Amino acid sequence: MNRTRSASMAQGGLNWDSLPLKLFAGGNAKFWNPADIDFSRDRADWERLTDDERSYATRLCAEFIAGEESVTQDIQPFMAAMRAEGRLGDEMYLTQFAFEEAKHVQVFRMWLDAVGVTDDLHHFLDDVPSYRTIFYEELPDCLNALTIDPSPAAQVRASVTYNHMVEGMLALTGYFGWHKICVERGILPGMQELVRRIGDDERRHMAWGTFTCRRHVAADDANWGVFETRMNELMPLGLRLIEEGFALYDPMPFDLSVDEFMAYASDKGMRRFGTIASARGRPLAEIDLDYTPVQLEDTFADEDARALAAV
Protein backbone atom coordinates (compact mmCIF):
# COMPACT_ATOMS: atom_id res chain seq x y z
CA MET A 1 0.00 0.00 0.00
CA ASN A 2 1.55 3.29 -1.08
CA ARG A 3 1.17 6.27 1.23
CA THR A 4 -0.32 9.39 -0.38
CA ARG A 5 -1.07 11.61 2.62
CA SER A 6 -0.62 11.93 6.38
CA ALA A 7 -3.73 12.35 8.52
CA SER A 8 -1.76 14.07 11.26
CA MET A 9 -0.92 16.92 8.86
CA ALA A 10 -4.44 17.48 7.54
CA GLN A 11 -6.22 20.77 8.14
CA GLY A 12 -7.51 20.91 11.69
CA GLY A 13 -5.13 18.20 12.86
CA LEU A 14 -6.41 15.25 14.88
CA ASN A 15 -9.67 15.26 16.82
CA TRP A 16 -8.44 14.66 20.35
CA ASP A 17 -12.05 14.44 21.57
CA SER A 18 -12.76 11.33 19.48
CA LEU A 19 -13.15 8.27 21.66
CA PRO A 20 -10.12 6.33 20.32
CA LEU A 21 -7.78 9.25 20.98
CA LYS A 22 -9.36 9.83 24.40
CA LEU A 23 -8.51 6.22 25.20
CA PHE A 24 -5.00 6.71 23.84
CA ALA A 25 -4.45 9.77 26.05
CA GLY A 26 -5.90 7.90 29.03
CA GLY A 27 -3.48 5.04 28.54
CA ASN A 28 -0.55 7.42 28.39
CA ALA A 29 -1.68 9.13 31.59
CA LYS A 30 -2.06 5.83 33.45
CA PHE A 31 1.17 4.17 32.35
CA TRP A 32 2.52 1.61 34.81
CA ASN A 33 5.61 -0.58 34.93
CA PRO A 34 5.24 -4.24 35.98
CA ALA A 35 8.67 -4.08 37.60
CA ASP A 36 7.32 -1.55 40.10
CA ILE A 37 4.86 -4.03 41.64
CA ASP A 38 6.08 -5.59 44.89
CA PHE A 39 5.53 -9.35 44.88
CA SER A 40 7.72 -10.00 47.94
CA ARG A 41 4.85 -10.92 50.30
CA ASP A 42 2.99 -13.07 47.80
CA ARG A 43 5.42 -16.01 48.09
CA ALA A 44 4.75 -16.39 51.83
CA ASP A 45 0.98 -16.19 51.30
CA TRP A 46 1.28 -18.73 48.48
CA GLU A 47 3.07 -21.24 50.69
CA ARG A 48 0.26 -21.05 53.27
CA LEU A 49 -2.43 -22.08 50.76
CA THR A 50 -3.65 -25.67 50.57
CA ASP A 51 -2.65 -27.87 47.64
CA ASP A 52 -6.10 -27.51 46.05
CA GLU A 53 -6.02 -23.75 46.52
CA ARG A 54 -2.62 -23.53 44.85
CA SER A 55 -3.86 -25.79 42.06
CA TYR A 56 -6.89 -23.61 41.36
CA ALA A 57 -4.92 -20.36 41.58
CA THR A 58 -2.27 -21.75 39.24
CA ARG A 59 -4.99 -22.86 36.81
CA LEU A 60 -6.56 -19.39 36.90
CA CYS A 61 -3.17 -17.79 36.30
CA ALA A 62 -2.38 -20.22 33.46
CA GLU A 63 -5.65 -19.32 31.76
CA PHE A 64 -4.85 -15.64 32.14
CA ILE A 65 -1.27 -15.71 30.89
CA ALA A 66 -2.15 -17.92 27.91
CA GLY A 67 -5.03 -15.59 27.15
CA GLU A 68 -2.88 -12.48 27.37
CA GLU A 69 -0.33 -14.06 25.04
CA SER A 70 -3.10 -14.98 22.60
CA VAL A 71 -4.58 -11.50 22.45
CA THR A 72 -1.12 -9.92 22.14
CA GLN A 73 -0.59 -11.93 18.97
CA ASP A 74 -4.12 -11.80 17.61
CA ILE A 75 -4.76 -8.03 17.76
CA GLN A 76 -2.37 -7.34 14.88
CA PRO A 77 -4.90 -7.78 12.02
CA PHE A 78 -7.20 -5.22 13.62
CA MET A 79 -4.46 -2.60 13.28
CA ALA A 80 -4.20 -3.33 9.57
CA ALA A 81 -7.98 -3.11 9.24
CA MET A 82 -7.93 0.35 10.83
CA ARG A 83 -5.18 1.41 8.46
CA ALA A 84 -7.18 0.18 5.49
CA GLU A 85 -10.13 2.21 6.76
CA GLY A 86 -7.98 5.32 7.18
CA ARG A 87 -8.64 5.60 10.91
CA LEU A 88 -5.35 6.87 12.32
CA GLY A 89 -6.78 7.50 15.79
CA ASP A 90 -7.88 3.89 16.11
CA GLU A 91 -4.56 2.67 14.75
CA MET A 92 -2.69 4.80 17.28
CA TYR A 93 -4.80 3.42 20.09
CA LEU A 94 -4.34 -0.18 18.98
CA THR A 95 -0.55 0.18 19.10
CA GLN A 96 -0.95 1.07 22.77
CA PHE A 97 -3.51 -1.71 23.20
CA ALA A 98 -1.04 -4.31 21.87
CA PHE A 99 1.75 -2.95 24.09
CA GLU A 100 -0.49 -3.24 27.14
CA GLU A 101 -1.42 -6.83 26.32
CA ALA A 102 2.27 -7.71 26.04
CA LYS A 103 2.83 -6.03 29.39
CA HIS A 104 0.10 -8.22 30.89
CA VAL A 105 1.98 -11.32 29.72
CA GLN A 106 5.08 -9.93 31.40
CA VAL A 107 3.44 -9.20 34.74
CA PHE A 108 1.66 -12.55 35.06
CA ARG A 109 4.92 -14.35 34.25
CA MET A 110 6.73 -12.24 36.84
CA TRP A 111 4.14 -13.17 39.45
CA LEU A 112 4.39 -16.89 38.67
CA ASP A 113 8.17 -16.67 38.95
CA ALA A 114 7.88 -14.76 42.23
CA VAL A 115 5.75 -17.46 43.89
CA GLY A 116 7.94 -20.25 42.51
CA VAL A 117 5.65 -21.67 39.81
CA THR A 118 8.07 -22.54 37.00
CA ASP A 119 6.73 -25.93 35.79
CA ASP A 120 5.08 -26.34 32.39
CA LEU A 121 1.46 -25.25 32.76
CA HIS A 122 -0.09 -26.49 29.51
CA HIS A 123 -1.83 -29.39 31.24
CA PHE A 124 -4.03 -26.92 33.11
CA LEU A 125 -5.76 -26.16 29.82
CA ASP A 126 -6.22 -29.78 28.75
CA ASP A 127 -9.27 -30.43 30.95
CA VAL A 128 -11.12 -27.23 30.02
CA PRO A 129 -11.82 -27.89 26.31
CA SER A 130 -13.95 -24.78 25.95
CA TYR A 131 -10.88 -22.69 26.77
CA ARG A 132 -8.98 -24.13 23.83
CA THR A 133 -11.99 -23.69 21.56
CA ILE A 134 -12.24 -19.99 22.42
CA PHE A 135 -8.58 -19.00 22.63
CA TYR A 136 -6.97 -21.41 20.18
CA GLU A 137 -9.70 -21.54 17.53
CA GLU A 138 -12.42 -18.88 17.69
CA LEU A 139 -10.15 -15.96 18.62
CA PRO A 140 -7.37 -16.43 16.04
CA ASP A 141 -9.83 -17.45 13.32
CA CYS A 142 -11.94 -14.31 13.76
CA LEU A 143 -8.98 -11.93 14.00
CA ASN A 144 -6.98 -13.50 11.19
CA ALA A 145 -10.04 -13.28 8.94
CA LEU A 146 -9.52 -9.50 8.97
CA THR A 147 -6.36 -9.92 6.88
CA ILE A 148 -8.55 -11.10 3.99
CA ASP A 149 -11.83 -9.37 4.81
CA PRO A 150 -11.57 -6.16 6.87
CA SER A 151 -15.25 -5.33 6.24
CA PRO A 152 -17.45 -3.83 8.98
CA ALA A 153 -19.22 -7.16 9.51
CA ALA A 154 -15.90 -8.98 9.92
CA GLN A 155 -14.74 -6.27 12.34
CA VAL A 156 -17.89 -6.69 14.42
CA ARG A 157 -17.39 -10.48 14.60
CA ALA A 158 -13.75 -10.00 15.61
CA SER A 159 -14.59 -7.36 18.21
CA VAL A 160 -17.34 -9.48 19.75
CA THR A 161 -14.93 -12.40 20.04
CA TYR A 162 -12.02 -10.38 21.40
CA ASN A 163 -13.45 -7.41 23.27
CA HIS A 164 -16.82 -8.72 24.41
CA MET A 165 -16.25 -12.43 25.02
CA VAL A 166 -12.55 -12.85 25.85
CA GLU A 167 -12.17 -9.52 27.67
CA GLY A 168 -15.72 -8.43 28.48
CA MET A 169 -16.99 -11.72 29.91
CA LEU A 170 -14.15 -14.12 30.65
CA ALA A 171 -11.39 -11.77 31.76
CA LEU A 172 -13.74 -9.66 33.87
CA THR A 173 -15.04 -12.80 35.57
CA GLY A 174 -11.47 -13.95 36.18
CA TYR A 175 -10.54 -10.60 37.75
CA PHE A 176 -13.63 -10.87 39.92
CA GLY A 177 -12.42 -14.29 41.05
CA TRP A 178 -8.94 -13.04 41.87
CA HIS A 179 -10.37 -10.14 43.87
CA LYS A 180 -12.61 -12.45 45.88
CA ILE A 181 -9.73 -14.80 46.63
CA CYS A 182 -7.36 -12.03 47.63
CA VAL A 183 -9.71 -9.62 49.39
CA GLU A 184 -11.64 -12.17 51.45
CA ARG A 185 -8.40 -13.73 52.70
CA GLY A 186 -6.39 -10.51 52.86
CA ILE A 187 -3.61 -12.21 50.86
CA LEU A 188 -1.44 -11.80 47.76
CA PRO A 189 -1.09 -7.99 47.73
CA GLY A 190 1.06 -8.13 44.61
CA MET A 191 -1.67 -10.02 42.74
CA GLN A 192 -4.22 -7.51 43.98
CA GLU A 193 -2.17 -4.65 42.52
CA LEU A 194 -1.53 -6.60 39.30
CA VAL A 195 -5.25 -7.18 38.75
CA ARG A 196 -6.09 -3.57 39.55
CA ARG A 197 -3.59 -2.31 36.98
CA ILE A 198 -4.59 -4.77 34.28
CA GLY A 199 -8.28 -4.17 34.90
CA ASP A 200 -7.81 -0.46 34.26
CA ASP A 201 -6.12 -1.21 30.92
CA GLU A 202 -8.78 -3.73 29.94
CA ARG A 203 -11.61 -1.27 30.58
CA ARG A 204 -10.16 0.93 27.85
CA HIS A 205 -9.78 -2.09 25.55
CA MET A 206 -13.40 -3.13 26.05
CA ALA A 207 -14.59 0.45 25.56
CA TRP A 208 -12.81 0.54 22.20
CA GLY A 209 -14.46 -2.72 21.15
CA THR A 210 -17.88 -1.41 22.13
CA PHE A 211 -17.19 1.82 20.25
CA THR A 212 -16.13 -0.10 17.14
CA CYS A 213 -19.30 -2.19 17.15
CA ARG A 214 -21.45 0.89 17.79
CA ARG A 215 -20.04 2.87 14.89
CA HIS A 216 -20.58 -0.02 12.49
CA VAL A 217 -24.12 -0.57 13.77
CA ALA A 218 -24.87 3.14 13.38
CA ALA A 219 -23.52 3.08 9.83
CA ASP A 220 -25.46 -0.04 8.77
CA ASP A 221 -28.20 -1.61 10.87
CA ALA A 222 -27.42 -5.01 9.34
CA ASN A 223 -24.36 -5.07 11.59
CA TRP A 224 -26.63 -5.23 14.64
CA GLY A 225 -27.65 -8.69 13.44
CA VAL A 226 -23.99 -9.63 13.05
CA PHE A 227 -23.30 -8.51 16.63
CA GLU A 228 -26.33 -10.30 18.04
CA THR A 229 -25.62 -13.54 16.20
CA ARG A 230 -21.97 -13.67 17.26
CA MET A 231 -22.75 -12.92 20.90
CA ASN A 232 -25.40 -15.64 20.94
CA GLU A 233 -22.88 -18.08 19.46
CA LEU A 234 -20.18 -17.31 22.01
CA MET A 235 -22.00 -16.71 25.30
CA PRO A 236 -22.93 -20.39 25.85
CA LEU A 237 -19.31 -21.36 25.11
CA GLY A 238 -18.00 -18.82 27.63
CA LEU A 239 -20.39 -20.01 30.32
CA ARG A 240 -19.43 -23.62 29.62
CA LEU A 241 -15.78 -22.72 30.17
CA ILE A 242 -16.64 -21.44 33.65
CA GLU A 243 -18.63 -24.59 34.44
CA GLU A 244 -15.78 -26.82 33.27
CA GLY A 245 -13.32 -25.10 35.59
CA PHE A 246 -15.57 -25.46 38.63
CA ALA A 247 -16.38 -29.10 37.84
CA LEU A 248 -12.74 -30.05 38.42
CA TYR A 249 -12.88 -29.36 42.18
CA ASP A 250 -15.01 -30.75 44.99
CA PRO A 251 -15.09 -28.97 47.34
CA MET A 252 -14.34 -25.76 45.49
CA PRO A 253 -11.18 -24.00 46.74
CA PHE A 254 -11.68 -20.62 48.42
CA ASP A 255 -15.43 -21.43 48.77
CA LEU A 256 -16.06 -19.89 45.35
CA SER A 257 -19.58 -20.29 43.96
CA VAL A 258 -20.20 -21.44 40.40
CA ASP A 259 -23.66 -19.84 40.50
CA GLU A 260 -22.17 -16.49 41.47
CA PHE A 261 -19.57 -16.66 38.70
CA MET A 262 -22.11 -17.73 36.07
CA ALA A 263 -24.44 -14.90 37.07
CA TYR A 264 -21.58 -12.40 36.99
CA ALA A 265 -20.43 -13.48 33.53
CA SER A 266 -23.96 -13.53 32.12
CA ASP A 267 -24.67 -10.06 33.46
CA LYS A 268 -21.56 -8.59 31.85
CA GLY A 269 -22.39 -10.20 28.54
CA MET A 270 -26.07 -9.27 28.44
CA ARG A 271 -25.59 -5.63 29.41
CA ARG A 272 -23.37 -5.06 26.38
CA PHE A 273 -26.35 -5.76 24.12
CA GLY A 274 -28.09 -2.60 25.28
CA THR A 275 -25.07 -0.38 24.77
CA ILE A 276 -24.56 -1.59 21.22
CA ALA A 277 -28.29 -1.44 20.45
CA SER A 278 -28.41 2.21 21.53
CA ALA A 279 -26.31 3.10 18.46
CA ARG A 280 -28.95 1.85 16.02
CA GLY A 281 -30.26 4.66 13.86
CA ARG A 282 -27.88 7.21 15.37
CA PRO A 283 -25.99 9.68 13.12
CA LEU A 284 -22.53 8.19 12.62
CA ALA A 285 -20.81 11.49 13.44
CA GLU A 286 -22.24 11.38 16.97
CA ILE A 287 -20.75 7.99 17.77
CA ASP A 288 -17.14 9.19 17.51
CA LEU A 289 -17.76 11.64 20.36
CA ASP A 290 -20.09 9.47 22.46
CA TYR A 291 -18.35 8.19 25.60
CA THR A 292 -21.08 5.70 26.52
CA PRO A 293 -18.65 2.75 26.09
CA VAL A 294 -16.28 4.25 28.67
CA GLN A 295 -19.15 4.96 31.05
CA LEU A 296 -20.32 1.33 30.85
CA GLU A 297 -16.90 0.00 31.86
CA ASP A 298 -16.65 2.57 34.66
CA THR A 299 -20.06 1.42 35.90
CA PHE A 300 -18.88 -2.19 35.98
CA ALA A 301 -15.75 -1.15 37.90
CA ASP A 302 -17.78 0.84 40.44
CA GLU A 303 -20.16 -2.08 40.98
CA ASP A 304 -17.27 -4.47 41.59
CA ALA A 305 -15.63 -2.04 44.01
CA ARG A 306 -18.83 -1.73 46.05
CA ALA A 307 -19.36 -5.50 46.08
CA LEU A 308 -15.83 -6.19 47.26
CA ALA A 309 -15.97 -3.41 49.85
CA ALA A 310 -18.88 -5.26 51.43
CA VAL A 311 -16.82 -8.44 51.85
From Swiss-Prot:
Keywords: Iron, Manganese, Metal-binding, Oxidoreductase. Pfam families: Ribonuc_red_sm. GO terms for molecular function: metal ion binding; oxidoreductase activity. The keyword Manganese applies. Fe cation binds at E101, E167, E202, H205. GO terms for biological process: deoxyribonucleotide biosynthetic process. InterPro entries: Ferritin-like_SF (IPR009078), R2LOX (IPR033908), RNR-like (IPR012348), RNR_small_fam (IPR000358). Coiled coil: none annotated. Its cofactor is Fe cation; Mn(2+). Transmembrane segments: none annotated. There is a cross-link at V71-Y162 (3-(O4'-tyrosyl)-valine (Val-Tyr)). Binds 1 Fe cation per subunit. It is an enzyme of class 1 (oxidoreductase). CDD domains: RNRR2_Rv0233_like. Mn(2+) binds at E68, E101, H104. Its EC number is 1.-.-.-. The keyword Ubl conjugation does not apply. Belongs to the ribonucleoside diphosphate reductase small chain family. R2-like ligand binding oxidase subfamily. Probable oxidase that might be involved in lipid metabolism. Homodimer. This is R2-like ligand binding oxidase. It comes from Mycolicibacterium paratuberculosis (strain ATCC BAA-968 / K-10).
